[in-house]
């Protein structure tokens, strides 16, 4: 009943205001009086409703007066336009103020002139504030660009860039902040996050689920990952080289089954709620990790679990050791046994299981390195996320590339070793300060040292090279996003793109004879992996001796 009365009051008030607006020939005060009078004479309204109606009239009147005043000020401020005064909104503020003041002199009466001048000055101050704000924004954007240029390589991440999400005596989880936090150039990776899990021997990662689709790669160690899907348990014994897809919302838990070695898992996450932001939810747990069951009222839990309050309190208050705890040998043996039937891909219908990258023959291999690559047919869950996984092992002193990907952006993690990365980047080029005119872009060499746990990104289309040190092999895990239809274009060695071009195209592009171009680009007889620059310098030094 109350809601109907409110609706009627609102409807009546709107009708009254429309009626009053029609009294355009009447003065403003009579218009307000007429509105209030209509409120008073309504017999179906009590005193409170009549008062609300009158307040509505006053609110409408004030808003209408405000709009009229703004229009009047705009007219005074820009009244010189179209009158032959060569006055426009793009002229400097001082001139606009002067023109406005001149218009005020035409006003009748001292008070009208004074009010007009005051409005001109206020408008001038407002315009100056807006101009200053706009200029500050431009300077801030320029500052951001300069900051990115000053940053040696915004595509490389080291230990200091990671944050720790979980840390206990039995292990930790570290996460790389959103890629865009480092540089706006990484906006293409805004919806992805990268995390590392390190679990000590016989450690147990308690059950949880995430609001993110994820790809796990076991970079070291062995263990068991158990997923709960549609009231069925799938347990997978995993080892180095295994790829596992965990769907968003899927409960899972992990145990390190080794008694001596740590378990290392690299996780690429694609959040499903907020781009670049994901949460971990713990059901089984207590105070640490906090169980989401504790968020519900006791009455709800008692009814849902059909258990008295005192028992619920005991259950959800015991766990305080964190999200990674120690398991006994007996518990590990029980959890490492196969779940409800075999679950390794591709022997189980719809199961996503696992795929081991190292069981494939390398797609590229010579004395200087090996490249292992997954394909969508190897592990179909990758196709759903449009992600490919690869692993490169560069022999010490060797190098891979230069090459570039046509569509895929590479997120690379150094698993072992050290070396150097070089990227040709047009975005951070300093050519705009060189004063030299060019018909195309200029490129800046982004060079960085990389080592175990370094992360680097190579955007699509950017040529790059990785060089291993002379001390040990350089092993790199790569996630390539936007992988569907990607083509790798090699820039040196066998099958490089220059060799395929016509002689005339080479001559026109390099402004030299085609034979000379062929001598340079046809000399390297290896493919993809080559002898690195350090080896070459070392051998030349020995030859000079």
Swiss-Prot record:
Highest taxon listed in the record's lineage: Eukaryota
Presence of the UniProt keyword Lipid biosynthesis in the record: no
Signal sequence region: 1-25
CDD domains for the chain: cupin_7S_vicilin-like_C (cd02245), cupin_7S_vicilin-like_N (cd02244)
Region (Disordered): 62-93, 129-154
Any one Pfam family match given in the protein's UniProt record, by short name: Cupin_1
Tissue: Expressed in seed.
Alphabetically ordered keywords of this record: Allergen, Seed storage protein, Signal, Storage protein
Biased composition (Acidic residues): 136-153
Residue ranges occupied by any Cupin type-1 domain in the UniProt entry: 354-517
Molecular function (Gene Ontology), one example: nutrient reservoir activity
Basic and acidic residues bias locations: 82-93
Keyword Signal: yes
Role of this protein: Seed storage protein.
Assigned protein family: Belongs to the 7S seed storage protein family.
Designated name of the protein: Vicilin Pis v 3.0101
């Amino acid at each position: 009943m109350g809601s109907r009365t409110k609706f009627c009051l609102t409807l009546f008030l709107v009708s009254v205001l429309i009626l009053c607006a029609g009294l355009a020939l009447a003065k403003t005060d009579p218009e307000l009086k007429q509105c209030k009078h209509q409120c008073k004479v309504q017999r179906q309204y009590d005193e409170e409703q009549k008062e609300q109606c009158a307040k509505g009239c006053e609110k409408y009147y004030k808003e209408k007066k405000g709009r009229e005043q703004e229009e009047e000020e705009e007219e005074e401020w820009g009244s010189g336009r179209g009158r032959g005064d060569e006055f426009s909104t793009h002229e400097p503020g001082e001139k606009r103020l002067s023109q406005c003041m001149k218009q005020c002199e035409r006003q009748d009466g001292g008070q009208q002139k004074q009010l007009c001048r005051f409005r001109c000055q206020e408008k001038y101050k407002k315009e100056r504030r807006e101009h200053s704000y706009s200029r500050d924004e431009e300077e801030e954007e320029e500052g951001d660009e300069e900051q990115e240029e000053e940053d040696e390589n915004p595509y490389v991440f080291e230990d200091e860039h990671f944050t720790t999400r979980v840390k206990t005596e039995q292990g930790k989880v570290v996460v790389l902040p959103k890629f865009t936090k480092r540089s706006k150039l990484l906006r293409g990776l805004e919806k992805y996050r990268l995390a590392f899990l390190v679990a000590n021997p016989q450690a147990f990662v308690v059950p949880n689920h995430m609001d993110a689709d994820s790809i796990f790669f076991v970079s070291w160690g062995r263990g068991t990952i158990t997923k709960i899907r549609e009231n069925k348990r799938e347990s997978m014994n995993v080892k180095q080289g295994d790829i596992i897809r965990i769907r968003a919302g899927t409960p899972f838990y992990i145990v390190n089954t080794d008694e001596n070695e740590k378990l290392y898992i690299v996780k690429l996450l694609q959040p499903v709620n907020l781009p670049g932001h994901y949460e971990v939810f713990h059901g089984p747990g207590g105070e640490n990790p906090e169980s989401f069951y504790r968020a519900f009222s006791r009455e709800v839990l008692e009814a849902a679990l059909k258990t008295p309050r005192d028992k619920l309190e005991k259950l959800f208050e015991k766990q305080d050791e964190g999200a990674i705890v120690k398991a006994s040998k007996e518990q590990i043996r029980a959890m490492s046994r196969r779940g409800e039937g075999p679950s390794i891909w591709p022997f189980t219908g719809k199961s996503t299981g696992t795929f081991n990258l190292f069981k494939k023959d390398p797609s590229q291999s010579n004395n200087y390195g090996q490249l292992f690559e997954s394909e969508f047919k190897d592990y179909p869950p990758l196709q759903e996320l449009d992600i490919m996984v690869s692993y490169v092992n560069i022999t010490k002193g060797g190098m891979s590339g230069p090459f570039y990907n046509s569509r895929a952006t590479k997120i690379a993690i150094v698993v072992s070793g050290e070396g150097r990365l070089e990227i040709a980047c047009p975005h951070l080029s300093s050519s705009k300060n060189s004063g030299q005119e060019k018909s195309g872009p200029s490129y800046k060499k982004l060079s960085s040292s990389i080592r175990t746990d370094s992360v680097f990104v190579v955007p699509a289309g950017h040529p790059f090279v990785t060089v291993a040190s002379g001390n040990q092999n350089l092993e790199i895990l790569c996630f390539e996003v936007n992988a569907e239809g990607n083509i790798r274009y090699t820039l040196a060695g066998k099958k490089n793109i220059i060799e395929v071009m016509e002689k005339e195209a080479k001559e026109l592009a390099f402004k030299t004879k085609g034979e000379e171009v062929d001598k340079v680009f046809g000399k390297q007889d290896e493919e993809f992996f080559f002898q690195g620059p350090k080896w070459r310098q070392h051998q030349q030094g020995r030859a000079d001796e």
